[in-house]
């Protein structure tokens, strides 16, 4: 155990003081490797402030014995993984000594630990105590940008620019993505100010283009990049130009741009990946498959690429190839759950029920667990194995209690979708015994109650949800629509739907409800307007049934029949459409 400062002071001679000072300086210079670069899990942390230019070595000043002792304790604490003590001591000493080396060390520790405020404070101390150190100025600029202090960040970034260092104007611009328009406008002015001094600086031009993109001005951003001959062939501006073209519905121009970029940068993964993804977006699946296969061949250790290739193969219905890549992922112990889930999907496509169930059963907790449980349940129910489905879900709830509520929801939904309404009701009731006030379970029970014509229970559950979450647009809309459709309480229905619409004005389901309440109240023109908006956003057979009914009520039977015919061709098993057509025309078909 280390002696307290008073005892240490009593034992130190002047020569020992010098030795201790040398030891501490050695620790300060070398400790960064032991504390920062050798992380607890053995992996080096990402260093945001890394640069190509070599900084001048910091000169350490003379420290008091108390400071030396505090710094030694910090280093020993770091070696024992007590990073909280190491950070605290270094921050205090950085503030006390104003020494560039101590400030840098404090900053590196804070950055590694994700201590944002300490990283900001110590980066500023470092930058002020080492005005000629470009690393320090860049660190301060980045931390200020992270803190939303963009104008101050620009000041420090300009110092880096003046020193011909590697700037991060792109990071500064990206960090402002979620800011308000006034802040972006001010930042754009700062960029323009610097561009007057450095009109051909590619980093500045790229940063400004990013800001213009975020400001909803893609045409100006694209023009800026295309007019900048100095950086138009660099990878980052090239990728931004591609994204801008796609956002402007000019993907046909983006493809040749990226293809030319591949020729210019054949070893750059980002360009080839952007090209492959754009091929997928344009539904050129065979070309995309070939491009992803080339990427996997070029970067054989990149399992993210291998997984993307497998998904493209699935989309292209290249089943055998998809299986090969998915099984490779399992063998490589990478994307294992996602691989099993997609192997299950593949088996379903090939009508191999046993293989599908086996693959879904191997998906562990994580992003693919619930989708796998849902598919497994659906497969069993379609095969008539209702009891087995219930047993598997019960076992899953027992083994993974954190997923219990979602598993009750899956069980009820799957049973309801497979015309097992009574069993769905029993499942949701069992869930509510365990979790009586869970809003998702209550909402689901309300939907099942409506199918059972138990409107009182439906309204009770939805009122409970709304009381707990007054701005729950889904619950407001569900209750409002049901009151409009199943009762004559149109005033209440309208109030609920209007509130939902105010909360979520572009939601197709809410727009459908707006159309329906207007129809119920005889406002046919408004009804048609809302229903057409809903159908444009979500081409759905139920919305088409509603729109056709409104057109029929307007005396536009031909238009109504055309809508019904179009959507009946798309979904011939739609009960809603067929009931509407039968009720209004007396015929089975329009």
From Swiss-Prot:
Keywords: Repeat, TPR repeat. It comes from the Bacteria. The keyword ATP-binding does not apply. InterPro entries: CellSynth/LPSAsmb/PSIAsmb, TPR-like_helical_dom_sf, TPR_rpt. SUPFAM superfamilies: TPR-like (SSF48452). Coiled coil: none annotated. PROSITE patterns: TPR, TPR_REGION. The keyword Repeat applies. Gene3D superfamilies: Tetratricopeptide repeat domain (1.25.40.10). TPR repeats lie at residues 235-268, 269-302, 370-403, 405-438, 508-541. Pfam families: TPR_16 (PF13432), TPR_19 (PF14559). This is TPR repeat-containing protein PA4667. It comes from Pseudomonas aeruginosa (strain ATCC 15692 / DSM 22644 / CIP 104116 / JCM 14847 / LMG 12228 / 1C / PRS 101 / PAO1).
